[in-house]
């Protein structure tokens, strides 16, 4: 049972190693063959993030220039003029509507001048700065092909490393098979075994003549 578990664990380790190295090699090959689409996806994502950040900058600029307060002031003036007209017309219902609108506008105006509005502006500016820093850390695909070169170089390195590992295993296995042979569970050289190894093998195998002949005479 112990021998079976030992062989099973060895087999699983070898299998996992083969799958891992094979997966790394395949990933490198796939990335190299598809470096153009990968670069296009990166470029598209980069430009979208940049576009969104520009839109946020426009909002931040509008808030910083206090366009909202200016617009609210214009609306407030129009409401006052409307109230004066309703007084001349004597329409109390319309005047009441203007009063409600003026009250709502005053609340918005107070918000735009308050600390909450300032916090909103500061938060938007922080978002702009953060996104700008992120974009600076990544290659700009609109200016150069640096990202494409990264993908090409890294994929080639990964592929060749995987191929080298696989090749090492194959060559080692071939050399082991060519220069050695397994006899009764013991791997010995196919060419000119040393006398000391011969002596110890005979003692170890309890001077079994059949085994001796198999190892040294065949």
Swiss-Prot record:
Subcellular location per the Swiss-Prot or TrEMBL entry: Cell membrane
Disulfide bonds: none
Membrane topology: Multi-pass membrane protein
Keywords of this entry: Cell membrane, Membrane, Transmembrane, Transmembrane helix
InterPro entries for this protein: MG279/MG280
Highest taxon listed in the record's lineage: Bacteria
Residue intervals passing through the bilayer: 11-31, 159-179
GO CC terms: plasma membrane
NCBIfam families per the UniProt record, alphabetical: mycoplas_twoTM
Protein name: Uncharacterized protein MG279 homolog
Taxonomic source organism: Mycoplasma pneumoniae (strain ATCC 29342 / M129 / Subtype 1)
């Amino acid at each position: 049972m112990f021998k079976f578990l030992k062989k099973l664990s060895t087999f699983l380790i070898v299998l996992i190693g083969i799958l891992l190295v094979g997966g790394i090699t395949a990933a490198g090959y796939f990335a190299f063959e598809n470096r153009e689409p990968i670069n296009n996806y990166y470029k598209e994502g980069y430009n979208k993030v940049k576009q969104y950040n520009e839109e946020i900058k426009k909002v931040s600029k509008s808030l910083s220039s206090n366009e909202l307060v200016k617009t609210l002031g214009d609306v407030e003036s129009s409401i006052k003029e409307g109230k004066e007209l309703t007084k001349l017309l004597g329409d109390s219902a319309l005047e009441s509507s203007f009063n409600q609108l003026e009250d709502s506008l005053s609340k918005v105006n107070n918000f735009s001048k308050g600390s909450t509005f300032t916090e909103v502006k500061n938060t938007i500016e922080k978002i702009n700065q953060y996104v700008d820093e992120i974009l600076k850390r990544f290659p700009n695909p609109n200016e150069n092909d640096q990202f494409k070169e990264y993908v090409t170089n890294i994929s080639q390195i990964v592929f060749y490393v995987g191929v080298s590992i696989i090749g090492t295993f194959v060559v080692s296995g071939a050399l082991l098979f060519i220069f050695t042979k397994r006899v009764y569970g013991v791997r010995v050289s196919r060419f000119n075994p040393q006398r000391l190894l011969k002596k110890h093998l005979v003692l170890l195998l309890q001077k079994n003549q059949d085994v001796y002949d198999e190892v040294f005479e065949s």
